[in-house]
């Protein structure tokens, strides 16, 4: 049943998606296979079993367009899903634009971001196969928070290697993870061989997602009843997130709207893919423009090289065909910690390579300027990562004003910034670098 006003477009719980969408069958060409780090041969399912459960490996390699969402997962999704699609009317008025701006609000989840969409699914499949503990990495802490939330619901333990600069910048993310029973370790650490090696070479390193991934994988591989879980990049992670875009499609249909522009921020690609992949065929047909926004300090899609590379610093992961800045790249310590990744999802990279998706990079200060305007018009404080999407949406709305076009702009609001207020304090005090 329709429950909406001009501000919010809502779906009933019964309208929540029953299947995830898998983009693999709709890519412009077959995806180059991941390669085994030791043999350089295509990875086989059994190669991944030391760190992933069989259920997720099957999803990773599935060619099926639609994958059923288990009812136990949908039951947990109902805690916060469906999420609202919101009309940003006050922002439109502030910009004096004829464009209509909508944002899909993923900050409604208990951890405050889109990340639980896959965290709950991954915890479910691991628990189903008897896994007792998960290890993972996290940048800004949103993914780590989501996995701690999910593992607690399935009575599992969780160890999170948090990039050191974010561990220092965002202490309340650590508190959130510990509240849900998680163990949080600043990375690099002395808990792993790779961590000790990096600390010996550079004791003052701010850390990176690539380093934290190496530590989490090493931990999982060396301990019984433990698997590794990740918050982005791989296809099974991205397909879990497509509940975002599938709901958005249904919500736009409720008000007879069709998007002209879809926008999302990009670190590894999960939030972006979740919103945009259900619309990929429309973009291939030229019916809309899809824009991926990344930080200029970590310009993977706009300045990276399209080639095989490791997903982590130590070279423990399979080699993935993607745009990459190099697996040993250490980005500047920007506040958008969730976007500080050297690579991107191979499916996203292929779509960028073929021109289905356009990429742009933005500097840090303009993103906070956009986030502040959004907070002062719409009332919600965006996460630093989300500010990248807000920036691009504002830029597109200004362009529509200049061209006098009534465009429909939809962007993904990946998470709120209530645990990122130090970043806003730094911005308001003039302490942020324009990297």
UniProtKB/Swiss-Prot annotation:
SUPFAM superfamilies: Tryptophan synthase beta subunit-like PLP-dependent enzymes. Keywords: Amino-acid biosynthesis, Aromatic amino acid biosynthesis, Lyase, Pyridoxal phosphate, Tryptophan biosynthesis. Pathway: Amino-acid biosynthesis; L-tryptophan biosynthesis; L-tryptophan from chorismate: step 5/5. GO terms for molecular function: L-serine hydro-lyase (adding indole, L-tryptophan-forming) activity; pyridoxal phosphate binding; tryptophan synthase activity. InterPro entries: Trp_synth_b-like, Trp_synth_b_CS, Trp_synth_beta, Trp_synth_beta/beta-like, TrpB-like_PALP, TrpB-like_PALP_sf. The modification N6-(pyridoxal phosphate)lysine is found at residue 115. Its cofactor is pyridoxal 5'-phosphate. It catalyses: (1S,2R)-1-C-(indol-3-yl)glycerol 3-phosphate + L-serine = D-glyceraldehyde 3-phosphate + L-tryptophan + H2O. It is an enzyme of class 4 (lyase). PROSITE patterns: TRP_SYNTHASE_BETA (PS00168). It comes from the Archaea. HAMAP family: Trp_synth_beta (MF_00133). Tetramer of two alpha and two beta chains. This is Tryptophan synthase beta chain 2.
């Amino acid at each position: 049943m329709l429950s909406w006003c001009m501000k919010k477009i809502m779906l009933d719980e019964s309208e929540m998606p029953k299947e995830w969408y898998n983009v693999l069958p709709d890519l412009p060409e077959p995806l180059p296979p991941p390669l085994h780090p030791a043999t350089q041969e295509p990875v086989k399912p059994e190669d991944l079993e030391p760190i992933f459960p069989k259920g997720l490996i099957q999803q990773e390699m599935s060619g099926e367009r639609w994958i059923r969402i288990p009812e136990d997962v949908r039951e947990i999704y109902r805690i916060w899903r469906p999420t609202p699609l919101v009309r940003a009317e006050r922002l439109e008025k502030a910009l004096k634009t004829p464009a209509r701006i909508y944002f899909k609000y993923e900050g409604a989840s208990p951890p405050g971001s889109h990340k639980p969409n896959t965290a709950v699914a991954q915890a479910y499949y691991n628990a189903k196969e008897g896994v007792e503990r998960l290890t993972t990495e996290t940048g800004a802490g949103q993914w780590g928070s989501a996995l701690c939330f999910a593992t607690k619901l399935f009575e599992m333990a969780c160890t999170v290697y948090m990039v050191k600069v974010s561990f220092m910048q965002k202490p309340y993310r650590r508190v959130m993870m510990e509240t849900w029973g998680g163990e949080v370790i600043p990375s690099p650490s002395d808990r792993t061989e790779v961590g000790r090696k990096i600390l010996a070479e550079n004791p003052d390193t701010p850390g990176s997602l690539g380093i934290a991934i190496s530590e989490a994988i090493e931990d999982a591989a060396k301990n019984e009843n433990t698997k590794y879980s990740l918050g982005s990049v791989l296809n099974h992670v991205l397909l879990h997130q497509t509940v975002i875009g599938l709901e958005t499609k249904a919500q736009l249909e409720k008000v007879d709207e069709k998007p002209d522009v879809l926008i999302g921020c990009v670190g590894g690609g999960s939030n972006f893919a979740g919103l945009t992949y259900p619309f990929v065929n429309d973009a291939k047909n030229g019916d809309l423009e899809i824009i991926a926004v990344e930080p200029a300090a970590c310009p993977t899609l706009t300045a990276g090289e399209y080639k095989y590379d490791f997903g982590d610093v130590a070279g423990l992961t399979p080699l993935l065909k993607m745009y990459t800045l190099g697996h040993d790249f250490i980005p500047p310590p920007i506040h958008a910690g969730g976007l500080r990744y050297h690579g991107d999802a191979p499916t996203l990279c292929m779509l960028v390579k073929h021109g289905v998706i356009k990429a742009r990079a933005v500097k840090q200060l303009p993103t906070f300027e956009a986030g502040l305007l959004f907070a002062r018009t719409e009332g919600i404080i965006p996460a630093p990562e989300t500010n990248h999407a807000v920036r691009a949406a504002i830029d597109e709305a200004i362009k529509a004003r200049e061209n006098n076009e009534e465009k429909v702009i939809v962007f993904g609001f990946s998470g709120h910034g209530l645990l990122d207020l130090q970043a806003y304090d730094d911005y308001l005090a003039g302490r942020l670098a324009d990297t």
